[in-house]
Amino acid sequence: MAARRGKSTRTASEVGAAGPRASARSVNGAPTVPEAARPGARRNGPSRASGCRREKSGPDPREKPQVRTRTARAEDQAEGPSAPSERVEPPSAQGASLLRAGSCRAREARSARELRPQAGATELAAPARMEAPPGAWKLQTVLEKVRLSRHEISEAAEVVNWVVEHLLRRLQGGESEFKGVALLRTGSYYERVKISAPNEFDVMFKLEVPRIQLEEYCNSGAHYFVKFKRNPGGNPLEQFLEKEILSASKMLSKFRKIIKEEIKNIEGVTVERKRRGSPAVTLLISKPKEISVDIILALESKSSWPASTQKGLPISQWLGAKVKNNLKRQPFYLVPKHAKEGSGFQEETWRLSFSHIEKDILKNHGQSKTCCEIDGVKCCRKECLKLMKYLLEQLKKKFGNRRELAKFCSYHVKTAFFHVCTQDPHDNQWHLKNLECCFDNCVAYFLQCLKTEQLANYFIPGVNLFSRDLIDKPSKEFLSKQIEYERNNGFPVFW
């Protein structure tokens, strides 16, 4: 999705007091990548098994002495069944892996002998190889720590399901302008890469809008004005037109108003105060535990994807050209995330969203159709993404409200991860036994993105998520310094 959320829809996605609760009901009572975007890139090299691409990071003053449709997946046996697109199904809820200095190279040599690359296969450019990371890592222990509890998942899913379906019935009923909305579940929980606690959910209420015309805003590639090719009388969205332009701010305001009115009738749920520039209506559920649910209105278009996406989604060597073509035949979405204009926002603009495609990619992430199936080889792609998300999350906790970290979100981490998957497209580069090296490669790529100030949107390569217009250089330098310190000292922030 787009830089979405601090959390990006919250994320890039980024508490109003509820009114009198007449006849209140309890919740619980309810039953490729452009060259500039690839730091340190080389041209297509030979396929290889995973190996650390490590260069010793510069010393830090605080540095310590170094001492496609699939059958059931193996990961689902450990974490429970996948959440379906139309309903949250509570998923089911070892051995620590110890990394010794120099072990990555030994494993790399073994992998090169045991796993020959496919004839004629090539990989996209990657950063230079690096020495094995220092210190003892117990990454499997970290993954166990951030694994979601089955009991917590069941409780959270039941409550979120009930609230969301209640609101959906309200919007679909009567003569609402949003009568045609349908549910689209997105975000890390439904991608099965949520970490720590099931306390955040993203839900799209999609509304199909046929025969629309997009007008790109200031060559941004990501933000658009929306017009109707024809506007026959009786169009329920006509009231949201502003000089023939479908106003994102007007539509979001009405959507928010309907939700706020309905939430007054549900005990234990409130609507968070509106955040400037956010496309989401955020619900706060207080029981059984505090849960936030971002509800995002999304316009669904079944037209061809905009021209700005033509060179995006570089998965041909990873998931295959056929998969790419099939994904690009899916609809695209526009969310009411306004473009920045000076010190304010252009409130009539909509932003492209591909969160549904991101979910599909993560669900079917292997080059081989048997990757992570019960009888297939288990890869460590999702484990690396979880660890990257946890690293950023823990640094934010460590430094509290430091201004330098405020604009970084999990969407930046996920975008960098997708680019690493493009660089290393083969399953033999992501063997679970090589988790430490694969994670280090992801960290190395993210560090280079910070240092070069280049991170291309995975779907809209002309959009640089690390441009100085979006994130200032001192903030990128601060995060880079902290990640280098963690990397050189065995990631103490994990413990």
From Swiss-Prot:
Protein name: Cyclic GMP-AMP synthase
Per UniProt, location of the Glycyl lysine isopeptide (Lys-Gly) (interchain with G-Cter in SUMO) cross-link in this chain: K206, K322, K359, K369
Annotated positions of the Phosphotyrosine modification: Y190
Cofactor note: Binds 1 Mg(2+) per subunit. Is also active with Mn(2+). Mn(2+)-activated enzyme forms an inverted pppGp(2'-5')A intermediate, suggesting a non-canonical but accelerated 2',3'-cGAMP cyclization without substrate flip-over. Mn(2+) ions are coordinated by triphosphate moiety of the inverted substrate, independent of the catalytic triad residues.
Record-listed Mg(2+) binding positions: E200, D202, D294
Region (Interaction with collided ribosomes): 316-357
Region annotated Disordered, chain positions: 1-128
5-glutamyl polyglutamate found at: E261
Naturally occurring in which organism (per UniProt): Sus scrofa
Post-translational modification: The N-terminal disordered part (1-134) is phosphorylated by AURKB during the G2-M transition, blocking CGAS liquid phase separation and preventing activation. Phosphorylation at Tyr-190 by BLK promotes cytosolic retention. Localizes into the nucleus following dephosphorylation at Tyr-190. Phosphorylation at Ser-410 activates the nucleotidyltransferase activity. Dephosphorylation at Ser-410 by PPP6C impairs its ability to bind GTP, thereby inactivating it. Phosphorylation at Ser-188 by PRKDC inhibits its cyclic GMP-AMP synthase activity by impairing homodimerization and activation. Ubiquitinated at Lys-389 via 'Lys-48'-linked polyubiquitin chains, leading to its SQSTM1-mediated autophagic degradation. Interaction with TRIM14 promotes recruitment of USP14, leading to deubiquitinate Lys-389 and stabilize CGAS. Ubiquitinated at Lys-359 by RNF185 via 'Lys-27'-linked polyubiquitination, promoting CGAS cyclic GMP-AMP synthase activity. Monoubiquitination at Lys-322 by TRIM56 promotes oligomerization and subsequent activation. Monoubiquitination by TRIM41 promotes CGAS activation. Ubiquitination at Lys-260 via 'Lys-48'-linked polyubiquitination promotes its degradation.
Motif (Nuclear localization signal): 268-278
Residue list for modification Phosphoserine: S13, S57, S188, S278, S410
Gene encoding the protein: CGAS
Residues binding ATP, per UniProt: S188, E358, K389, S410, Y411, H412, V413, K414
TM stretches of this protein: none
Lineage: Eukaryota, Metazoa, Chordata, Craniata, Vertebrata
Residues covered by region (DNA-binding): 1-134, 147-190, 359-382
